[in-house]
């Protein structure tokens, strides 16, 4: 029986704590986890980019470049990846070609092997400069499509909708022409359902030949089932994290997936050291106690079915909740969540991913706290 090896990217050092703890893991915590994760056998560790750069400077009084150098030193055996917001890099505005080129160059020199590159509007034009810079450094270019849906909440096949099957297939073909080494499907809000994933990945596999990676969030409770159907459809890799920082608005845990493929009847395998994961769980259990104040749970449920309506990505929910709490407006969170899809529709149904999600979220908060559209941000 032929078995297929599924490649696994671990997000514990980046998106997991961004989603659950407002990106507050400091260098002390990172330094304890990096060498342990390096011994697991992961194909990739996602360690940088996204909100980590901003959080280091704004909240932690740490140098983000020092963090990258430290992780590279402590995890020499595993590929390191980072998330870049296209022309926005790790910021919230467009940067010049010179800055983009230099940022990519230094990031590569400091240890990044794989650049996961996306644009909040899925606009390939906003990815061109960074893509060329990454290829010039002979690094792996993983171009990324932000998965979103219309009001129906499902992957559409009708041409009257924006986010159709053809939309994603054509975007993938464009990415291949741009020199992508692999494609990432970024399901930042956990909207991709299992059978929609099967349909999407099957169609992508029929049209492109580069590897496909699935990055999804557990927010709606669909993620683990979606990963399994994606694997059955031919996806080449998935993103997971250690169970201590998994689920809720984070990624699915690696442990159940690993157990699933240990079965003698499985046609898939993952080269992961389970005993090493157990050691990391123990370390993480102690470390996360430092960050509980940033994890504000407004309900007991482990999932949020409401995300299928408001479509807020995992990383944004933790920050939005934290900000409302700091301003003594946490009781208005349900109203803000109701307002977000209305603002999104008013703005033309863009994907809710950084920095668009922050713009829509901030406007929704303003609409709830003050008169609707009485205050409109410059970005909107």
Name each model-derived stretch.
Residues 1-116, 120-380:
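Catalytic cores and adjacent flexible loops of soluble metabolic enzymes
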């Amino acid at each position: 029986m032929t078995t297929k090896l599924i490649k696994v990217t671990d997000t514990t050092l980046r998106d997991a704590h961004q989603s659950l703890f407002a990106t507050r893991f400091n260098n002390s915590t990172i330094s304890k986890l990096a060498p342990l994760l390096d011994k697991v056998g992961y194909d990739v560790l996602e360690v940088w980019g996204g909100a980590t750069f901003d959080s280091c400077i704004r909240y932690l009084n740490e140098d983000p470049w020092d963090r990258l150098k430290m992780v590279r030193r402590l995890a020499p055996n595993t590929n390191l990846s980072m998330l870049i917001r296209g022309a926005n890099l790790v910021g919230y505005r467009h940067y010049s070609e010179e800055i983009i080129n230099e940022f990519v160059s230094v990031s590569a020199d400091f240890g990044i092997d794989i650049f996961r590159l996306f644009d909040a509007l899925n606009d390939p034009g906003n990815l061109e400069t960074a893509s060329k810079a990454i290829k010039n450094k002979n690094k792996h270019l993983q171009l990324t499509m932000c998965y979103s849906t219309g009001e129906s909440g499902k992957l559409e096949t009708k041409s009257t909708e924006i986010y159709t099957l053809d939309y994603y297939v054509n975007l993938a073909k464009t990415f291949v022409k741009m020199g992508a080494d692999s494609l990432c499907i970024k399901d930042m809000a956990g909207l991709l359902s299992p059978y929609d994933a099967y349909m999407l990945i099957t169609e992508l596999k029929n049209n492109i030949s580069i590897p496909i990676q699935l990055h999804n969030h557990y927010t709606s409770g669909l993620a683990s089932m979606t990963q399994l159907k994606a694997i059955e459809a031919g996806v080449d890799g998935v993103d997971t994290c250690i169970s201590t920082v998994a689920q809720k608005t984070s990624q699915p845990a690696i442990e159940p997936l690993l157990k699933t493929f240990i079965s003698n009847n499985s046609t898939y395998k993952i080269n992961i050291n389970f005993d090493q994961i157990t050691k990391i769980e123990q370390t993480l259990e102690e470390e996360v106690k430092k960050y509980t104040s940033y994890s504000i749970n407004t309900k007991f449920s482990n999932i949020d079915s409401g995300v299928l309506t408001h479509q807020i990505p995992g990383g944004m929910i933790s920050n939005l909740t934290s900000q409302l709490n700091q301003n003594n407006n946490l009781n208005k969170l349900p109203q803000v969540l109701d307002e977000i899809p209305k603002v999104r529709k008013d703005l033309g149904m863009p994907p809710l991913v950084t920095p668009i999600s922050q713009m829509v979220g901030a406007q929704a908060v303003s609409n709830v706290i003050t008169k609707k559209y009485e205050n409109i941000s410059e970005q909107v």
